[in-house]
């Protein structure tokens, strides 16, 4: 039940994270929203809180429909709270990649590019962790893979809160960097950005 859930819901988290601000910017709405009597920080925090709320509701629905309901129909040894533990780990995992997608959306020229890169890293993390379990040479690389620290059904017996805190901390760093970047970047009127750099013009010789 939990093996592919980080990938399936993770794709949604990446798409949502990359589009929290970049989507409205490319559609020409963000400059109109920013013109309202609300600070950039307030807009940013509101979008992030909405994203986290949506993710929490999705995971609660998956917990209730996927585990709680079947547990009431069949004899399942775990309690409802124990069945909720893997979703706490999954929330931290999704927060990390959602924050990464948000940061990339503030750096890269387009939301599509940000979502593609974050999604690629998500899938790469899955394969690196899997290979690290069977290929000895990949074990070191797997230590740097976020998927390694996702706790699936084993978390019902006990959750490693250090791993959860680590995923949340890395995700928080990504979100803070995205906030810092959003405060200092120019908002495009519409369309995708580019890679062009503004160079200082050489002053004519006297």
Language-model-derived ranges and their functions:
Residues 10-17, 65, 99-100, 146, ...:
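Hydrophobic/aromatic residues in alpha-helical transmembrane segments
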Residues 21-52:
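Helix-loop-helix units of permease transmembrane domains in multi-pass membrane transporters
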Residues 45-106:
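Secretory targeting signals
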Residues 114-199:
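Terminal transmembrane helical anchor/hairpin motif
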